[in-house]
Amino acid sequence: MAHQITPVIYYFNPNIYPREEYEIRKNESKRHAESLGISWIDDDRFSTGASMPFGYEEAHKAWHCDVTGLENEPERGKRCEVCFYHRLLATARKAQELGIDWFATTLASSRWKSLEQINRAGEAAAQLANSKVPTAHVSFWAQNWRKDGLQERRNALLKEYNFYNQQYCGCEYSLLR
């Protein structure tokens, strides 16, 4: 598209609850990607590499296992960092599988999330993925999507594209708060 970057949207969000909210966000992501002619990958499953892929319910349970014991953590607490890592590791692995050198996340555009946590999780995910498959090196693009007017641009695009803007991060713990 621009700057010789061809984006690919990888949809993997087993943290989102309930399933209806997950479907709304997934369909909105797909609609937007299609309207822009961007490749969109639906990864309703989580694959550990050697094992068979899981469906949404199983992927949500696997995510839930990762955050067990962290249910009472506040927003921006340890639970969020574990959640970011879980999802960004899957993203790093998918990038390796597709031969993509860099990956980023829209999480970094949310004012509700800690940019430092997101960047730590992304770097750790790239490091683990590279240690497992050193011949397919990936790097995390730690871009601050909130500075230099990008937050305002995001808000304008939400309106322009009539894009669904969720009111909570997605997990049941943030929904309850």
Which residues does each PLM region occupy?
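Nucleotide-activated chemistry modules centered on ATP-dependent adenylation/adenylyltransferase
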Residues: M1-R177
